[in-house]
Every structure is written in C-alpha cells, then in structure tokens.
C-alpha cells in the first residue's frame, strides 16, 4: 500500500510528527492495541532530535572526543602520523550515526505496525 492510499484507511490514533514525543505516543498507542498512523512532514522519521539537534551534536562531539583520546593515548603513538582527520570527515561520521538512528526508529514503527505517512 502506498502513502497515497493512506487517506482511505481508518486509524484509532493519528500522531503529528515522529520526534521523541510523537514516537513515544505512537508506540504507547500501538502497544495498547490501537491502529496508529504518524504524519511526518520530513522525508525521514526522527524529528529535530535525530536530524539537527541532539543526535548530530552528540555524535560530532563524541567523534572529536574519541579522536583526542586516540591522539593522546601512548598505545597509539604515531598511528596517525602522515594521516589527517578533517572536519568534513568528522561530519561524515556524525552523518552515519544519524542514518543509523533513522534505521532504528524506522524499525520501531515497522515492528509496532505504525504507519508513517510522509
């Protein structure tokens, strides 16, 4: 069934947005036996938390922190010699974390039979 067919379906609960609040509400309603749909205006689930707020900033911070620990750990002395870790590379690492979070959250909706309408 495509998203265009969603308007012909009936739901017990319709949740606006798939951020943390919407996700929690949708999962609780689904587990209570309700037929649930989530309306998401963006192309991926997760809301601001996943795409531009909490997750990206923490992923970038963790990547930088890990790099600093690696560079200062005597066990790895010289391991990065001649190699450069660039800011675009750190952003790429953070982006991969975001994609992983989207996949996890998409799995929540699928396993709980919650329809996401985008």
What are these language model-derived features?
Residues 2-5, 10-11, 28-34, 40-118:
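Glycine-rich flavin
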Residues 17-20, 43:
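Glycine-rich Rossmann-fold phosphate-binding loop(s) that bind the pyrophosphate
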């Amino acid at each position: 069934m495509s998203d265009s067919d969603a308007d012909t379906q009936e739901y017990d609960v319709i949740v606006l947005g798939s951020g943390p609040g919407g996700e929690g509400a949708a999962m609780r309603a689904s587990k209570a036996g309700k037929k649930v749909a989530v309306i998401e205006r963006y192309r991926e689930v997760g809301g601001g938390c996943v795409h531009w707020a909490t997750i990206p900033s923490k992923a970038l911070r963790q990547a930088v922190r890990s790099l600093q620990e690696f560079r200062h750990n005597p066990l790895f002395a010289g391991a990065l010699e001649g190699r450069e870790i660039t800011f675009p590379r750190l952003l790429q690492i953070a982006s991969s974390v975001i994609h992983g979070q989207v996949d996890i959250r998409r799995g929540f909706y699928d396993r709980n039979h919650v329809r996401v309408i985008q």
